[in-house]
Amino acid sequence: MEARDCDVIGLQEVRCRPADLPEGAFGDRHVSWAPGSLAGRNGVALLTRTAPAEVRSWGTHLVMAPGQAPTPAQALTGNTDGLPTELLPFADEGRYIEVDLADTPLTVACLYLPKGATPDPANEKTIAKQDRKMAFLTGFRDHLVRRRQECTTQGRHFLVMGDFNIAHENADLKNWKANQRNEGFLPEERQWFDTILSPDTLIDVVRAQHPDTNGPYSWWSWRGKAFVNDAGWRIDYHLASPELAS
């Protein structure tokens, strides 16, 4: 973090409970954190150099100054006004938080999209899990449209980054031919990605800058030698409004 010297850092799967976060864990960064209600799971956070002008999340969240330890008294209530119906069951899971930066007209969102399962007709649980993911995708597409349009009206750029649990294109997955029927690379998931990207709405920044590059991958299976062989998936993205992307 010190070497990169980033203005904003997005974290997903911040699985610890607020009480377990060491004091001063993020140094001189301001922390906006939606831990979620599921112990040991999910959680998203944004780290910024300066205090954000506004912080929004669907569920309970914390806003901490540098070196400040989280306490229950700091918990802020989330806002689900206007949230698509499909997203309401996810509101308290620690999957989305966004900040308005105070020193530049930019809204940054951090996302941890639910993981589904490869549907198996003989296993109802896999079908239900994938249906749940697809419901999130339906609602989140509408949410993205709304937030992007609101930011445009306010004269703000918009960026959503995080773990989408989907490889969009063949270049985003090393063994794409063998995974065409697997969750994370299913046709309906990839088609959903097509619907949220366009030159006039949101742009996949990495792919725009590196159109002919495989990857860069951001996740590797712990099985076998996937990491050693760089047999990975690109499931983490920065999607930016056109002016910001350029």
Residue ranges and their predicted role:
Residues T50-S246:
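Active-site regions of metal-assisted phosphoester/phosphodiester hydrolases
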Residues M1-T80:
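Active-site surface patch of divalent metal-dependent phosphodiester/phosphate bond hydrolases
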